Structure formats: C-alpha cells, structure tokens
Amino acid sequence: MVAALERGLSASKSFNFKRMFDSSSTKQQQSQTIVVENGDSHIVESNTPESQNSDSFVESPVESSLPMISPLTRPGKRSERQQADMEMMKDRFAKLLLGEDMSGGGKGVSSALALSNAITNLAASIFGEQTKLQPMPQDRQARWKKEIDWLLSVTDHIVEFVPSQQTSKDGVCTEIMVTRQRGDLLMNIPALRKLDAMLIDTLDNFRGHNEFWYVSRDSEEGQQARNDRTNDKWWLPPVKVPPGGLSEPSRRMLYFQKDSVTQVQKAAMAINAQVLSEMEIPESYIDSLPKNGRASLGDSIYKSITEEWFDPEQFLAMLDMSTEHKVLDLKNRIEASVVIWKRKLHTKDTKSSWGSAVSLEKRELFEERAETILVLLKQKFPGLPQSSLDISKIQFNKDVGQAVLESYSRILESLAYTVMSRIEDVLYTDTLALKQTLLAEETSDGGRTTETDSESAGSSNSGEEAEKHDPHSKTLLDFMGWNDNSSKGGDKPTKSPNLTPKKLSYLEKLENLNGFRSPKDRH
C-alpha cells in the first residue's frame, strides 16, 4: 500500500510539472489529487485557479473542486456593481463627448463648458440638500467622491513638455523632453482636493451633536423658533437650542469650525478669482461695452472714484446696497469700467474711439481703485451670483483645464458659504437664547430690588414718625435751637446789601488761578 501511494504521488508531481508548460492562455489548470479510501488509492482530477497549489492534499473530492470565496467579495455582486459603475461612466463621458447634444448633430457646447456644467450639476445634486448642520449620508458622500474623481481624471492627461535629464547605462547624461501635468493643474488640483476633504470633515465633526436640533417649519415649535435671520429662508428648518443656550465647549467648537470654513472659503475664492482673471475676455462682451468708463459707471460713481481723495469703505457706505440686485448691478458696472480702462492702457491706436484725454497715470489709478472696490464687494457679499463678465468668460472658454479649476473652486466656495451660514444660524439662535435668559434674570432681580426698596422706605418712614411722637428722642441740637435757625436760614443765603463784586483784569485772574500773588494780595 505504501509503495502504491508513493507511485501515485510521483505520478501526480510529474504530471503537474508537465502541465506547467502547456497552454498559458487558460487561466485555470487541471490538477490531480490522491484520495485514499478503504486502503485503495486513486487519482481525482479537479479544476483549480493558477494561484492554488497543485500539491495540496485534501480529504474529499468535493472540497477540492470548490474554491474558497469570501462572502464579502462574491464575484456576482462585485461584477454587477462594477458593471453599473461602468455604464454610468460611459453615459457621463458620452454626454461630455457630444457636448450635451445627444442628437449628435454638432450643435452641442464646447468640451470645456460641458465639463464645467457636469461638475456644477453634480455638486447641485449632492450638496443641494444640505439644509442642516449634520454629516452627509454615506451613499451621497461615496457618490460624490466617485463621480468627482471621474470628472477630474480628465486633467491627468492635460500635460506640457518640460526638460529633463536621462542617464544611459554607459553613464552618458542626455537632456530630453518629458511630459508633466500642466503647471496650474499640478498646483491647484491637489489644493482643491484638500479643501474638499476639509469641508466634508467639518460636516462629519457634527456627528452625534445633540445640543442643537432642527424642527419642522410648520409645527408649533417651528413657528416659535422663527427669527429675523430665518424668516426669509422658508426652505430651511428652524434650529433649536436649550433654554440657557449652548454650553461653552460647544460654543467654542462652533466658532473654531466657523474659522476653519472661512479659511477654506477664502482659499477657494482666491483660486477662482485667479483662474477667472487668466481667462480671455470674449469679443462679444467687449463689443457690448460703452465707449468710456463714465458711461459705464454713471456720473455720480465716476466722480467719487476719480476724486483726489478716495476711501473705498466710505464709497460703499454711501451707496444703496440693500438688495442683491443692486450689488450685482454695481459689480457689473465696475467690472465693465475696469475692462475699458485696461483696453485703453494697452491699445496703441490713439485715434480710435477708445482714446480719451485722461492720462495713463490717472487711468491706472482709477483702475486700481475700481479693483479694490471689487475685492471689497466679494468679501462683503460672498454668496453673490456671478457677474456678466464671469458668465461670458465661462461660456466662451475653450481651455478644459481652466474650466475644471473654475467650476471646482466655485462649488467649493459655495459649499463653504453654505456650511458657514448653517453655523451662523446656530450661533444666532444661541445668542437669542442667551439674551432671553439674561432678560428673565434682570426682570426677576428688578422685582426683588423693588420689594427691598419699598421695605426700607417703609421702615425709615415709620422711624421718623416714631421720633416725632417720642419726646425722649430729641437730641442736644434740638434743645439748643440750632436746627430751627439753620433750617430757616438754609432756604436763602444772606447777602450784604451794598456789596459789589470786585472786577479783575485778565492778568489778575490768571495770577489768582496760578497762585502768583501772596495771600494778602488776594483779599
């Protein structure tokens, strides 16, 4: 029996060694296993993957034919999920390739605008429902990361040639040109991804936070929770805090998160402004501009900007910016004037209609003042819609890399503004709760103070009446009669009838004040 077992093992090994050099195109190979039953040995063939060891000894031919598959990585479910992702990716990139024109008639938009619209629409579908200060659901978060990676993968293939050195085997150094991701994408895409992760982490930090909560707007509690800040935002649920307000650690945490989100918003705003400034101004926008800056700004605004002394803060304080429409109109006018002045600075044709009598130095000064106003407007009104110049640049832009940077930074800026607004809603509600608590305490303290004052006043009046009725309560002054004289004479002071005040000169008054004269001369 032992000899037969050894012969079977040697035959199995030689057979497997021969099968290693057979056709390599198949991913599965046939292996043999020795099975001993009732003292007899026989060879059983089974199909196993290449990675499985052919010399493994198993106890049953059924177990040898079944591969070990984890329930978490079942091929059926995994292939279905991958197939669904593949179909979704094909659909997205087909729309991008066709320029959102599914008819294929060539009437679609440019690739840059199609990609910009795809990123904007994705952010609207993911973050448009973020009405509460709470973490994003896991399915939406996973969808955002997956689909934004698909859209950003286009920038991996936008490259530029840079010089590099290559050393051969014999030690000779040769200078060659290699491809690298374009400079602006290489610097800004990782930064924007970091800002994206910071915003999602900020929302995750509010997981399990139970010191503030949201109620339905139509409920009785929601009607009571309305305030001046949330009256116009009918789509947002009112926020509630405890009667005494938030605890000090929670309040500090909210202020810390607000500062972090503010930094994210400023960084995204800076990247967006830089990308927009590098985009070319379309000719259609230039053709729609008036001849000079005065016609664009109006006489009053132009006079304020071109004065010798100019303060941008005071300039904005004098204007009516009560509505969003008025602020946007002011921004459009100032941007148009900046474009006009820049074109006049760079134009060489002095006889054209762009020429004017204003010197180049003054025009540069006016341009700097107008750009300062634009920066202040962007800081004071971060949620302001895009201006006419920005919309025109995005619409006619042909650079795919700039389109991705502009849209990605814009949606991150918008998301940061949304998160900061939700934090400010909670802090405003907390401030109202604190004011109500302090007002209630002052009211209760005022009632106690009034009761104490009335009691003390009553005791003093009773004491005076007791002194009047008690003859033994008189003092020595009462017996001497000094109180009567002082009370009679205290009403009107006695005056000497014929005494006239001495008139002093200015020098004498000065000497009296400074004490230069002797005490004898002063009288």
Curated annotation (Swiss-Prot):
What does the UniProt record report as the effect of altering E175A in this chain? Decreases GEF activity 25-fold
Q: What is the effect of changing L98D?
A: Loss of homodimerization and GEF activity
Q: Predominant location of this chain?
A: membrane
- Which GO terms of the molecular function aspect are on file? guanyl-nucleotide exchange factor activity; identical protein binding
Q: Mark out the compositionally biased spans (Basic and acidic residues).
A: 465-475
Where the record annotates domain PRONE, the positions are 76-440
State the InterPro entries in the record.
Answer: PRONE_dom, RopGEF
- At the top level of its lineage, which domain of life is listed? Eukaryota
- Cell compartment(s), UniProt: Cell membrane
Q: Among its keywords, does the record have Transferase? A: no
Q: Where is the composition biased (Polar residues)?
A: 44-57
A Pfam match: PRONE
Entry comment, domain topic: The PRONE (plant-specific Rop nucleotide exchanger) domain is responsible for the GEF activity.
What this protein is reported to do is described as: Guanine-nucleotide exchange factor (GEF) that acts as an activator of Rop (Rho of plants) GTPases by promoting the exchange of GDP for GTP. Active as homodimer.
The UniProt subunit note reads as follows: Homodimer. The homodimer interacts with ARAC5/ROP4. Interacts with ARAC11/ROP1 and ARAC10/ROP11. Interacts with PRK6.
Report the protein name in the record: Rho guanine nucleotide exchange factor 8
Q: Which gene encodes it?
A: ROPGEF8
